[in-house]
From Swiss-Prot:
This is Major prion protein. Belongs to the prion family. It comes from Odocoileus hemionus (Mule deer). Cu(2+) 4 binds at residues 88, 90-91. Keywords: Amyloid, Cell membrane, Copper, Disulfide bond, Glycoprotein, Golgi apparatus, GPI-anchor, Lipoprotein, Membrane, Metal-binding, Prion, Repeat, Signal, Zinc. Residues 1-24 form the signal peptide. Disulfide bonds join 182-217. Sequence repeats lie at residues 54-62, 63-70, 71-78, 79-86, 87-95. The gene is PRNP.
């Protein structure tokens, strides 16, 4: 009796296991089958996915949610949601929507070498043999000894330069040679430039211009001399043996 019950239970378990295996074989795999998103070639594309996965709810002939002949949700002849001749997102002809605008010329890239070269050149003026152009100054108030010239200067001072040309101060022995060279090149350059524009200077203009430029050249020399001595003092300070020893000790403490 007991043996018959054991045999019955074994038979029931065998049938149950066989049925479960059969159901597993018949159950469709997720995303498999023809036109169900499964990959017929597992070696191509991601595992379990189709080479061309559907993008949202389209029926037969309606991939990506569009109607017949309307891929990606666009109308007839409107691929990717754009109008006729407007591919990929509704951009106008030659715009390309969200894709690259092939019809638009690319912006020129800034050449950093040119920028750095211009910054390093500073105020060096081309065509004047290494002269530099100083910063703009207010034209000085000068009295020429008589009312006529004083009035003439006030009425025409805007015609005279407010910047001077000069060389570095270390190329001169003293202030007088610097100022003399500065006045000559500045007056000459301003006269030539203004004459080419159709404006001429009288002897009175030249006299007043030389006085004005002389005062500005003296101011420019004082500025350049002060800056030159400050740079020299900094070099001497940092090149002295005690300072070098102190800096080396600090670097040793930081690195160590």
């Amino acid at each position: 009796m007991v043996k018959s019950h054991i045999g019955s239970w074994i038979l029931v378990l065998f049938v149950a296991m066989w049925s479960d295996v059969g159901l597993c074989k018949k159950r469709p795999k997720p995303g498999g089958g023809w036109n169900t998103g499964g990959s017929r070639y597992p070696g191509q594309g991601s595992p379990g996915g189709n080479r061309y996965p559907p993008q949202g709810g389209g029926g037969w002939g309606q991939p990506h949610g569009g109607g017949w002949g309307q891929p990606h949700g666009g109308g007839w002849g409107q691929p990717h949601g754009g109008g006729w001749g407007q591919p990929h997102g509704g951009g106008g002809w030659g715009q390309g929507g969200t894709h690259s605008q092939w019809n638009k010329p690319s912006k020129p890239k800034t050449n950093m070498k040119h920028v750095a070269g211009a910054a390093a050149a500073g105020a060096v003026v081309g065509g004047l043999g290494g002269y530099m152009l100083g910063s703009a100054m207010n034209r000085p108030l000068i009295h020429f000894g008589n009312d006529y010239e004083d009035r003439y200067y006030r009425e025409n001072m805007y015609r005279y330069p407010n910047q001077v040309y000069y060389r570095p101060v270390d190329q001169y022995n003293n202030q007088n040679t610097f100022v003399h060279d500065c006045v000559n090149i500045t007056v000459k350059q301003h006269t030539v430039t203004t004459t080419t524009k159709g404006e001429n200077f009288t002897e009175t203009d030249i006299k007043m211009m030389e006085r004005v430029v002389e005062q500005m050249c003296i101011t420019q020399y004082q500025r350049e001399s002060q800056a030159y001595y400050q740079r020299g003092a900094s070099v001497i300070l940092f090149s002295s043996p005690p300072v070098i020893l102190l800096i080396s000790f600090l670097i040793f403490l930081i690195v160590g």
